[in-house]
Amino acid sequence: LGSWEILRGHYLGVAYDSLAANLLKGTAEVDIEAIQMERYEVDGKIFMYFGPFPALLRLVLNFVAPGYYGSWSRLSTLLAVFLSAVAFGRLISSALMLNQSVSSRARAWLTLTAPFALTLGTPLAFLVSMPNIFHEAMAWGLCGTLWTLLATLNLSIHPETRAHNMRIFAISFGVCLLSRLTTAIPAALLMPFVFIRYVRLETLEGRAPLRVARKLSVPCSLILISCVFQLWYNYARFGSVYAFRDLTKYFFPKTHLGSDFSLFRLPDALINYFGLSDRYFVSLPPFVRMATTLYQRPELFVQVWREQVISLSLSACWLIIPGLVGALYSLWRPCQSLARAALAATLFQALLVMMYFFVCQRYAAELVPFFVVGLCVFLSVFRLHRAWLTTLAVTSAFSILVSVTSAIRFNMVSNAPISPTLYERLNWLFFPQIAAAIADSKATFVTDLVPLPDSSSPAQTSPDRDLFGRPLQLLGYSPVKGLGMVAGSSISYEIPTDTAEFHAIAMLSERSAGCNETSLVFEGHDENGALVFRQPLNSNTPEPVAFSASVVGASRLTISLRHETEKSLCEIANLYAARFTPKR
């Protein structure tokens, strides 16, 4: 963000380059330095669990420009999102052609603006803001899904271009299948309907069966090539063409995961993906943020890690509302058969995603195709009065604001690579208290003081570094003059003379913030054991918290970190910009 560098790698994106290089050698292995912990390990060999399509794309890119090895993540993700926007714009245009109530001016306005709403007012904004190894595969999978939907619906709307649409369908199916398996589900389910519709159209025009078969040979060959490559990819990793994954070979035990899919997860998934809660709102501009997933039945989900989401009812309301109306309309009103089939196929995909053992923002992108088809139905049958168009415009602007700002805020808290100039400007907008704390030139920071010699606890406390020895970093600032601490640790300082208050910023480490039910508390005590401050932290509030406390009359401050509830493996937290401020 803010650097405008198109050719730039992101987290583990180089793993696709590694896979591409090894594919030329006839193997699906990946260098462990490239994939790190996001890997399968089978008989001492390292593999990735992501689809190989981004690696196939890199075969071409690294051949053309080998000097940019490892730098394609951003370009690849941007290309996938751009092609998704193109497909969506064409879907909207095709749907509006069926609606005689829409003026040519309104049709042009919707066709041109809808791709921007999809890109910036849905989870795609989050994917493109962090084009890491996870998001790149998801972006290409979603891209393929949208193009298969376009080809499917155009068989009914533009039957004269059916041969072209069949080729698009076949290529897009391959992109889906080789990017992310679940994104290929709609195309796989629609495939029989698409081929039957094509044969029927050809038969109605009197085409001979042999000629029809010859025309189908190209799309069938493309589909077959994709399937064969995926089966080889399975065999190369697991020794079986039927094994698409094996979580027993993953870096944490499968016993933490439970079953892969369960209907009992649907209520929790619906609440996290679509529910409204005050957790998504903050008191400072832009007033929205992502929130850590909450589960009523946490035993059904991954126990070792949780991520953050923002409700689609906020971040994509322009799509959710008319998409749901269009889907419901198709249940009892006349509707194109392929549109109904597409709704059923994408609904099945969405249900599978919501029955999975993990909920996160990138998976929300797989819910988008269902609402896209519903929106196409809505635009093709409803009279679009000025009020509807105004509502679409307002909700699109609102969704873009929520999606973009929440993605930026998440990137900042995650210390994502953002240009220093942009970081500084955003900090004063999103976190003014913290920006002011970092800039405080009159304070005495604890890292400038020498701890009292007999005060440190046996547990580790690291000035200016976290517990893994890395420099403390917060919102792009590094170093931030703080303490990396583990539960059970404490450290004491002599309070400088003429000190009025102690100020600090508390935050769970990234590892602790993702754990289930992490609950830690920073406490400060004076030389008499009296409580000076108490700042609790838990995994439901993963953002930094600024606090202060008076230390007037005290000569010594002991800072400690402890578990507030039952002890867990996630027990690391940091104090940033910990400082004593003088009397005014």
Label for each model-derived stretch:
Residues L1-D440:
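Membrane-proximal envelope and lipid/glycan-remodeling enzymes
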Residues P432-R584:
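Gly-Asp-aromatic-enriched flexible segments
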